[in-house]
UniProtKB/Swiss-Prot annotation:
GO terms for biological process: inositol catabolic process. Keywords: ATP-binding, Kinase, Nucleotide-binding, Transferase. GO terms for molecular function: 5-dehydro-2-deoxygluconokinase activity; ATP binding. Gene3D superfamilies: 3.40.1190.20, putative 5-dehydro-2- deoxygluconokinase (2.20.150.10). This is 5-dehydro-2-deoxygluconokinase. It catalyses: 5-dehydro-2-deoxy-D-gluconate + ATP = 6-phospho-5-dehydro-2-deoxy-D-gluconate + ADP + H(+). PROSITE patterns: PFKB_KINASES_2 (PS00584). It is an enzyme of class 2 (transferase). The gene is iolC. PANTHER family: 5-DEHYDRO-2-DEOXYGLUCONOKINASE (PTHR43085:SF49), HEXOKINASE FAMILY MEMBER (PTHR43085). Its EC number is 2.7.1.92. The keyword Kinase applies.
């Protein structure tokens, strides 16, 4: 079974949300207190997905807000050099800074992130900075859940979703739950549900779906039936090492295993999964194959030091799938 898009659109995917800085520990197997060296990368889920999609050959655009400083210029330059169209990146003139994420790699199973997200530039993206014509030119709009955490970014994203629906652009909601950005579970559930019910494709972990539903121990079947009663026609729920499942509105269920790899760190997997899964869909592969692409891409990224820099090529993904088929 394949998923169809409007092939007349100029862009394959336009992502909206945060682009920030990842500072990944160079020294492994030690706590952050003892870590002296970090490597700098572009980070943030929608930025990573845009970069990953571009590296896979998709025509990709990005809508977001970056600071008017060295970090902001680094983010824009890096994304532009990977092929992402950055013409819709607004520059913050009010002194807000880029979000910073310091990563700690105690072991492959014990990784943590220390976030600096107070008053960050990406959450100041205004509705007036969302261009209708730009969104109308894309096959899909990729929305990240974290962009809903604060105003005015929240309203900018809601406007983008409305414009996408108006112009028959598929809305893809990557749940991307980061608890440090939200003030309450109730607030998260309200805004996640609001966007999920307007989305054509919803992607997240089982835990993230529980956050959206504001409960624990939820079932995949209940989650997808609720979304299918609204706009969704494809829902992907990831279960870590148990693999991932895609549910179609027509009643089909597909599963992809988690590919074996030597894990270095646990972060970055979700972004690489989304970019490769969406690549599979938009390039005309069936849903089951797209799931395999997502799972294989995630496996590759967790074996490497960075997230954005480690986003794989199509050849690398297909090589891993062939090796473990």
């Amino acid at each position: 079974m394949k998923y169809t898009f409007n092939e007349e659109k100029e862009f394959d995917i336009v992502a909206i949300g945060r682009a920030c800085i990842d500072l990944n520990a160079v020294e492994y197997n030690r706590p952050m207190e003892q870590t002296m060296t970090f490597s700098k990368y572009v980070g943030g889920s929608p930025a990573n997905i845009a970069i990953g999609s571009s590296k896979l050959g998709l025509k990709t655009g990005f809508i977001g807000k970056i600071p008017d400083d060295q970090h902001g210029r680094f983010i824009e330059t890096y994304m532009r050099n990977t092929g992402v169209d950055t013409s819709q990146m607004a520059v913050d003139k009010d002194g807000h800074k880029a979000g910073l994420a310091f990563t700690e790699i105690l072991s492959p199973e014990e990784c943590s992130i220390l976030m600096y997200r107070d008053d960050v530039a990406d959450l100041y993206l205004a509705p007036s900075e969302v261009n209708e014509d730009y969104i109308a030119k894309s096959k899909m709009l990729l929305v990240s859940g974290t962009a809903l955490a604060k105003s005015p970014s929240r309203e900018a994203v809601l406007k983008a979703v409305q414009l996408a629906k108006k112009h028959q652009v598929k809305v893809v909601f990557e749940l991307d739950y980061r608890p440090y950005t939200w003030t309450s579970a109730e607030e998260t559930a309200v805004y996640y549900t609001l966007v999920a019910e307007q989305s054509d494709i919803v992607i997240g972990t089982r835990d993230e779906f529980d956050v959206m539903e504001n409960k624990s121990g939820g079932s995949n079947e209940e989650s997808v039936q609720h979304l299918f009663a609204h706009s969704a026609d494809l829902v992907v729920i990831k279960h870590g090492v148990e693999g991932s499942y895609a549910y179609s509105k027509s009643g089909d269920v597909f599963r992809a295993k988690a590919y074996k790899t030597k894990v270095l760190k646990t972060f970055g997997a979700g972004d690489s999964y989304a970019s490769a899964f969406l690549y599979g869909l938009v390039s005309g592969k069936d849903i089951e194959t797209a799931l395999k692409y997502g799972s294989a891409s995630a496996s590759i990224v967790v074996s490497k030091h960075s997230s954005s820099e480690a986003m794989p090529t199509v050849a690398e993904i297909e090589e891993l799938i062939a090796a473990q088929s």
